[in-house]
Amino acid sequence: MAHILGIDLGTTNSCMAVIEGGQPVVIPNAEGFRTTPSVVAFTKTGERLVGHAAKRQAITNPERTIISIKRDMGTNKRIKIDDKEYSPEEISAMILMKLKADAEAYLGEKITQAVITVPAYFTDSQRQATKNAGRIAGLEVLRIINEPTAAALAYGLDKEGHQKIMVYDLGGGTFDVSILEIGDGVIEVLATSGNNRLGGDDFDQRIIDYIADEFMKEHGIDLRQDKVALQRLKDAAERAKIELSSALQTTINLPFITADANGPKHIDMVLTRAKFEELIKDLVEKTREPVETALSDAKLTPEQIDKVILVGGSTRIPYVQEFVKKLTGKEPFKGINPDECVAIGAAIQAGVLAGQVKDILLLDVTPLSLGIETLGGVFTKIIERNTTIPTRKSQIFTTAVDGQTQVEIHVLQGERPLAKDNKTLGRFILDGIPPAPRGVPQIEVTFDIDANGIVHVSAKDLGTGREQKITITSQTHLSEEEIQRAIKEAEMYAEQDRKRKELIEARNRADSIIYQTEKLLRELGDKMTETEKQQIESKLKALKDVMNGEDKEQIERAIDELTKSFYDVSTRLYQQGYTASGPQGGPNPGGGQSGPDGNVNTDYKVY
């Protein structure tokens, strides 16, 4: 059975896992790391980089490096690179394509299906955008599940007995808290709350502002106005934050950060953990209200919670751990990896869908109330927040004026009493209502939320049976035409990436045979005939001339010609008793071993 990939598509880092032998296994990326930076970059030559490669070059290429795109999912934002604009879905798809390709290389099979996690507090449009990103990346997204729920799956897979747990999930860009009940293979979400604009990125920004403000006081230069300097500050801030989780102070050293008429300027300062905690105190405090709301909605007190589980890289910060301990009165559980448990949970859900994991039932909830605008601009809720999904609910409405023949259904998501203060999910018209006094027509509005948390709405005139229905798509949602275009471009990029990789591999082989040939000439050149030496030197030069070009076939032809001459000569020398560390005992050109047919079986790495 083909694997279904479980993906934690994070703000700062992403992770993937599958079920192997009935157990979830985290898949390392091509570079060997278990998490992949959610970073995309475009070089000035048009090459696309994703993950560690993109993050490494961010300092020298800040304007063409895209970070934290998850925060813009479900919005109208577009990222312009050269003459092309990219939607957040397309950038996220590039990250997903990298994960998909690395998983395929690791598993040795094609991946076509996935379960992707999202913050519990993601709106409908953000969930739709995530599903579209998967589609653009060539993945059928079987299920969208909430990150805290996935973490609970990872925690509760082998647990016996009944427990009420709180998942406190503070990641790079979002905060979620969920209250769940686990027992007898059932994982039921009782309540969820959160903040989609709060996370480790905000902590980094506080450090950046502190460093920049101190530098401004001393030198009168605002480093935030210099994009390269700002990117160096971002890197330094992230490193400092991580180091302060285990150290009481850290040194921030950035030589030649800028220059003025008096010469170059440097940063060399100490940031203590106490100062860092002072900088982020109010941000951490913002997590209090969602925690209290979730407890209230679940009708529980902190004392009734059996375990508090920390999820997300930002929960490694000691101040956050202490805050959670004081807030809940419990020592947080640290027995699961906060960076990997969400992907593991996604893989478990994938295993449930594939029938590989038995006896687990997941009951999730909708994070925000759903309803419509009614007379006077009032928001009338049809489905309350924290309702278990999938669900379907209906309510009867009527007309507001005499003779009204059509009604506009304005679909909203939120908790505020007035429609204007909530998020619009969509609008549609039900027409063809027979003229009648107001209050007479009976219009049934039905909300249907599927297991992905995606909303479907219908309105039906009970008098005529006339009905209109839509699957909600926000104004920022990509059209089908745009999705198809993005899919084609993604396939084109995948083809370009494949060709680029093949070109790099050809250059690597060329570099290896050049090294071995030059070594042979140094060690045994005096044992060759003049004709042999000239022939090898000629073909060596020909390969050097083309190896940095863009024509892979030309490079491979030059490699083949040089390899043939190399082996003709080295075989003759070997038979005469001369040795060199290519033909006898040592590695062959390309780092492999000679096969029985005399061809070279290469084994190399591409960096």
UniProtKB/Swiss-Prot annotation:
Query: Which residues are recorded as modified (Phosphothreonine)?
Result: 174
Q: Biased-composition ranges for Gly residues? A: 583-595
The region called Disordered is annotated at 577-607
Q: A Pfam family name for this chain?
A: HSP70
Q: Which InterPro entries match?
A: ATPase_NBD (IPR043129), Chaperone_DnaK (IPR012725), Heat_shock_70_CS (IPR018181), HSP70_C_sf (IPR029048), HSP70_peptide-bd_sf (IPR029047), Hsp_70_fam (IPR013126)
The UniProt induction remark is:
By stress conditions e.g. heat shock.
GO MF terms held by the record: ATP binding; ATP-dependent protein folding chaperone; unfolded protein binding
Sorted UniProt keywords: ATP-binding, Chaperone, Nucleotide-binding, Phosphoprotein, Stress response
Q: Which family does it belong to?
A: Belongs to the heat shock protein 70 family.
Quote the NCBIfam families the UniProt record gives.
PRK00290.1, prok_dnaK
Listed name of the protein: Chaperone protein DnaK
Source organism per UniProt: Caldicellulosiruptor bescii (strain ATCC BAA-1888 / DSM 6725 / KCTC 15123 / Z-1320) (Anaerocellum thermophilum)
Encoding gene per record: dnaK
